Amino acid sequence: MLCGIPTSGKSTYVEKLKKISYWENAVVLSTDAYIEKQVQRLGRTYNEIFDDVIDDATREFELEFNAAKNDGRDIIWDQTNLTVKTRRKKLSKLPSWYHRGAVYFEITLEEALKRNETREGKYIPKSILKRMYHQFEIPTTTEGFDYVEKIAI
């Protein structure tokens, strides 16, 4: 499970991870990926369509999760997963035999805001990004993870 605020590098990490043979067949669960497909299909920006497609993206996410879980496939959760409550809810849906790992992305607020400025069509209002930064709780093994890894940006 990837954990970190927007702009921290989670999706870039997934792209690199998928090139490693062990992870190449893993199912990547990402509402952002679904939204990006709709961006391409509709020729609009992420921000322009977000409110219109987030419910569909969430449904697609759940369908993909259930299929992957039922098939026993490796799953990479590519979402913010900012709080203990959010992560525990997701972990509770996994069968007990699943190996549970958390990779969290440590980034300064200044760097996140700087990166946010360069995101064309996917800009997050500063107030929201700041709120998410302050909401973020570093994952621990007490939440049910077998291991926790930090990636410092």
Where are the model-predicted features located?
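Hydrophobic anchor at the beta1->P-loop junction of P-loop NTPases
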Residues: L2
